[in-house]
Amino acid sequence: MRGVAFAVIGLLAGIGYGSVSAVSAWPLESAAQDPAADARKAAEAIDTSGKPAEAEVAWRKVIATQQARPKPDPETIALAHNRIGDTLYYRGKPDLAQKELEAARDLLAAAGLGEGDMMSETLSNLGTMHTAQGRPASDVELQRKALAMRVKLHGPDDTRLAINYYNLGYALYEFGQPLEAADSIELGTRMRLATMKPDNPDLFLTLATAAGIVESSGRVLTAIEFAQKAVELVNTHHPKHPYAGFVRGVLGKTLTGAGRSAEAIEVTRQAVDELAASMGEENPLTLDAIGNLAVSMARLGRFDEARELTMRSIPKKREERAPDTVRALITASNYAGEGGREAEAIAIAEDGYAFAAKKMPPDHAIRAQVAFVLAIHLERSGQLKRALELMQETAAIFAKREDAESPRRLGADVYLGGLEIANGLRQQGYARVAAAADKMAPKMFAIAQDPALGASNSYYETFARAAEAAIQAGHPGDAFRYHQLASYDVNVLASQQVAMRTAAGRSSEAAALVRDLQDAGRTLRVLNRQKAGLLARGDVEGARRSDASIAETEAKSAQLTGRIEVIAPGFERLSRPEIVPLATLQSRLAKDEGLFVAMPSRSRTSVMLIRRDGVKVAVSAKPRSAIRPLVTAVRQSIDTALNSGETTLPPFDFAASHALYAALFPAEIRSGATGLTRLHLAATDALASLPFAALVTQPVRGTGDRALRDARWLIRDMSLDVTVSMASVGAGGTPISRATAFAGIGAPALTGTPGKPIELAGLFRSGRADVRAVRGLPPLPGAMAELSQMRAALGGERSTLVTGADASEARIKTMDMSQYSVIAFATHGLIANQVDGLEEPALVLTPPNEESVGEDGLLTVSEIAALRLNADWVILSACNTAAGSTQSAPSYTGLAHAFLYAGTRSLLLSHWQVRDDAASRLSVATVRGTASGLDRAQALRQAMLALIADRKVPGGAHPAVWAPFVLIGA
């Protein structure tokens, strides 16, 4: 969490240890008639965070009534000064709050109460005011002193120490010691959670602040636990509290940290609106929420928006929030770099570095972070010596402050080693890289296997940098291993899960149990996402039902694991991630077969060409910020052609296509490709949405039909397929023949106008699919013929067609799909967020006459994943079936991942909306080619080349028509 000083929330206001001794000093028989007692009771009934001005008046009355007594109680007066300090703090006046706390301290000391609970609380709160004014070092000193007092009084485990552990944790966090801070603040938070009433507003504020701090130390699950509990308490007891937006913003931040950015945006936007209304635009909490929204935007690839939001989150009076200012400048610099604004990125980072040097101690963690970011940008601009010095500064600070295996420290070592290599210290640098990267791998795998988190690309950048270093240091085997680690995403995990079922025996009890266990893990991820959305919307009862379902599913998982371990003792070994050694992969490749690896990072793009008899490697100077616009340009020229409605299609962007080819296939790689007839592709980031077949290997003159037909497309040189898992490369797909069991599904009964553009705006009503709108989608006249021709190519004895009114969700879900080795869907494909209300990709089937539970005409990703398949090949002749959620999303997410998980070993998908005549031509020709003995990749290549050459097909030579399909896992 950015450094909004909220350790005091609930700590200044809540525990009231001094009040215990103060009350006991008053005669019980007279307490009811005592004006001082009445004043205190009235003051304690007012929420200091929700109504600070009213609370201040009430607590000043407590002081006045005490001073009117013959013998004023010093502890009660000290307590009142503490509470008044609360009210001033909540109104942004920590300097005035400090004076109140100093008055309390001096009063207690003069009364001989310098070692009691009230003094401990006062010192703790006083220290927090120091941090609020930019003095965290003195805060840490005061917090340790306050904690020592209470330990002496009560021992280290007494719950009355919660305030001290909590405030010490926050002080350590602001002082730049996140790991020790997380230990202390988590202990204090759990103590408070166990002892405080759920309707006490201090509790939800405690949980929210703790969530932000433990998340920054890498404890993602604990952060989500605390944040979700905080939102639940707000929704239940304090929906109109002025800090409700703050709590929601913390939940959004923790969701983003867990790789759940799409969910986080909804929560955080609500937080920004609530905070702006209750606190004002310049309030630190509002600015913090704006910064968190920027992070979520960036995770979805929206870097310009993210940079603008981040700069907006910087306070006008930067000096008053120095740590926050530097953090925001670091973040804005990163976003500028990712958006291709390199000069701006350096300028912002230089500003942050200079500001931190003036305002922060030399060994502060934020100094390390800003030096790290500036070093990366300077390296990219060729300033290697200064970049190395800055990265050495970063590593030295992290080595002093963080655990030896903390992700930040290990990441800094990877980058430091890379810079040492760049500065000529090759052996020393690579030893550092290898040691750090190897320690990070188990951490990444643990997160990927966790049901609440799952595989993501959060470690991508560090392993990509390690791969670059390995290439530069001459270690191609290690570079290949690091590429696999960087690319360990949901599809690799799905392929691994299918392999586990196969190893257990496809028809065995063990395989069924393994599938049930994997389904339970998938269900847990869905339930956790649902819970976050319910909490964001204030649905307390729904969130509680989710909790019950989560607990039930976790118990089921534990039971299944126990049963599997009994009947399949080797299961644990099978469940470990598999990283394929370079030599093993080479041994699987045929002489004319190669694997091409491309990994864009923020600094450069590393590429490898692996053949049976050798490896070629190169590092391109183009970072992903340069690669992404080129991919976008190619895709935009295709989209323009698709949307033109003209017989003669608009020009293809040959310049961008060739620029990409030149960047990805430099001379070193091209020299190794001679004689290849088949190339497996393992490309990440935006390259996953690139139709490699449409790269031109030579510059093209002209833009017309002749230029398109004569262009030297990469597909002319070799067949192409995309690999999901290195374990399957070179293994060879199962050949198909006329005896293959085939299921053709599609040509749904729709009533719209054929050929009319799809109108999506009315598909959903109140968050659910409108079956009438689904039925009104345009039919696909060629789909029936397409499926029939595939069936004819494969033979009819073991084949079936499910079309028209029969092609419904109910039919598909009740079919025994495991008996078909080839399955084809010919229908519309919809991607998530293409229409409001559609939260996941879907295939369109025939909708029911009336809406019913579980059947609305859309076969979604979740429903596809629940199918039990045993297919060698699934063909999705539909729109956008290869689409991921963003440029930076794991490759081929959505429908592809669902079919892989369901039990598919190979897929034919479309990158974009496929013209009906082209879809039929390409898919049928590919199936016919495979039935005649060609491998799938070669069959697809020949189908593409035939379409390019056929002058009878309008626009057939344009990649928009012939290049939509991609073969995955061939």
Walk through the language-model features, giving the residues of each.
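N-terminal leader/linker segments that initiate helical-solenoid repeat arrays
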Residues: 22-64, 68, 75-83
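Residues that mark the junctions of alpha-helical repeat units in TPR/alpha-solenoid scaffolds
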Residues: 35, 70, 77, 112, ...
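Conserved alpha-helical positions within TPR/SEL1-like repeat arrays
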Residues: 40-48, 76-90, 117-132, 159-174, ...
